[in-house]
Amino acid sequence: MNNDRRFGLKRHITLPGELALDGGSLLTGIEIAYETYGHLNADASNAILICHPLTADQFAASDHPITGKPGWWSRMIGKGKPIDPERYCIICSNVLGSCLGSTGPSSFTPGTETPYAMNFPVITIRDMVRAQAKLLDYLGIRQLKAVIGGSMGGMQALEWASTYPDRVKSVVIIASTARHSAQNIAFHEVGRQAIMADPKWRQGNYYEEKDPPVAGLAVARMAAHITYLSESGLTARFGRRLQSRQEKSFGFDADFQIESYLRHQGIRFVERFDANSYLYITRATDYFDLAEEHGGKLANAFRGTKSRFCVISFDSDWLYPTSESRVIVHALNAAGAAVSFMELSNPNGHDSFLLDAPDLHRTVHGFLEGDRA
């Protein structure tokens, strides 16, 4: 497959035909941006799909073209690492609705040079997965050795197991949930309202002016980023320490290190992400409820599955706490699925799966080694 131009870095495909969305709309001319690492073997049996979290992208193990930083999961993917491109063909695509090359609100409507903006249809996690399935068809991959995802990526992995059970041999769900809770929805709504309250949002029509609502998007990111951390981690890293000063300013600059850190996170984020995409993708996660899709009983989503599952949580994650993972495990047990579960200890909260987490790496490696077929 070395000379097959379908595989490699910075790849694009226009999906053939139409994609019917859960909301009732039809999308045509869908662009999907993706990357692959490693080579597909002769019988196409070594493919692993990586599903990215909320605001990540297809650059899982290559330098980001905007920030120049290493891939968001380069700790997990690479030579000698748990997901090794010398053994596997690894695929990661930018989700439908995003802004790093796949069709989303910043894309032109077919046959025009006018962005969709808020005319883009509301999408779901299942819509994202349907688009990924079409990508795999194009790549000639009938069945995945594994689908792996953390956070929103875990939602996609669950949806893969439910919607395309015959196409997935193994499923790894990390720091995720089978449905968004009221608290999760609440935090997302704060972020969306911050964006829409920014005068530069202009009802989503800010592309022509090239003056996006960066202030609102930065605040949305700051609010969300808090949920990715843990109280113990914040205390250990920042405490109440002041930022570059000996005394409080008695003003509203960033007196505390944590304030400066959050502002920095917001500024960095707006350099690489689109505000409207943030609205659409957070809405997709809020709509996610796998049990609701199957008559209100989560076990029904996995009935008859032959896939192996590995569910992993972190003890400091309060965005998707271990209790959410246990719900998934109980449903898989009720469905008679083969499932292993690990709660890992890590002080870094929800973001633990993106950071140095040796226990996570050992767990994923061991699970993949358990299926050598």
From Swiss-Prot:
**Lyase in keyword set:** no
Active-site positions on this chain: 151, 317, 350
Keyword terms, alphabetized: Acyltransferase, Amino-acid biosynthesis, Cytoplasm, Methionine biosynthesis, Transferase
Task: Name a single GO biological process.
Answer: methionine biosynthetic process
The reactions it catalyses are: L-homoserine + acetyl-CoA = O-acetyl-L-homoserine + CoA
Q: Which GO molecular function terms does the record list?
A: homoserine O-acetyltransferase activity
Question: Which Enzyme Commission number(s) are listed?
Answer: 2.3.1.31
A single Gene Ontology CC annotation of this entry is: cytoplasm
Q: Which subcellular locations apply to this protein?
A: Cytoplasm
Q: Which residues form the AB hydrolase-1 domain?
A: 46-355
Please tell me where this protein is predominantly located.
cytoplasm
Which pathway is this protein engaged in? Amino-acid biosynthesis; L-methionine biosynthesis via de novo pathway; O-acetyl-L-homoserine from L-homoserine: step 1/1
InterPro entries of this UniProt entry?
AB_hydrolase_1, AB_hydrolase_fold, HAT_MetX-like
| Residues that, per the record, bind substrate | 221, 351
According to its UniProt entry, the function of this protein is described as: Transfers an acetyl group from acetyl-CoA to L-homoserine, forming acetyl-L-homoserine.
The UniProt family comment states: Belongs to the AB hydrolase superfamily. MetX family.
Q: How does it assemble?
A: Homodimer.
Q: What is this protein called?
A: Homoserine O-acetyltransferase
Organism, as annotated: Zymomonas mobilis subsp. mobilis (strain ATCC 31821 / ZM4 / CP4)
Taxonomic lineage: Bacteria, Pseudomonadati, Pseudomonadota, Alphaproteobacteria, Sphingomonadales
